[in-house]
Amino acid sequence: MRNGAVQQMNSNPNASLYPWSQRRLTYTTSHPSPFPRYGAAVNSVASKEGDIYLMGGLINSSTVKGDLWLVEAGGNMACYPLATTAEGPGPRVGHASLLVGNAFIVYGGDTKMEDSDVLDETLYLLNTCMSLFIGVLG
């Protein structure tokens, strides 16, 4: 260990037990927080720029969302809705996502708003450089 690491552990003896840290997100005044949210899709590893994408989910135990948010974790922790140039996956809960290079991939989840609705089996790709969603039929 380096001297700085030893000093840090000495100042906080439980540092190795609690490796998590907290940072506040910053929102623009025109956009309220998207949290709390249940069943949203979030990339498990940030992009090389530190970007985290959050799509859809359930808020207030009753409203299913299909919105897309970006958290700039590599910078000032800005959090804001991301506009796309094509229609995205739409409202859903419990879907899966993966970030591969510049593609945020979304699949599945509960998309039924009415009992007669059919589940969406389309695989969606978001080109994160162009903010463009592309649907690939399954």
Where are these regions (language model features)?
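Kelch-like beta-propeller repeat domains
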Residues: 1-138
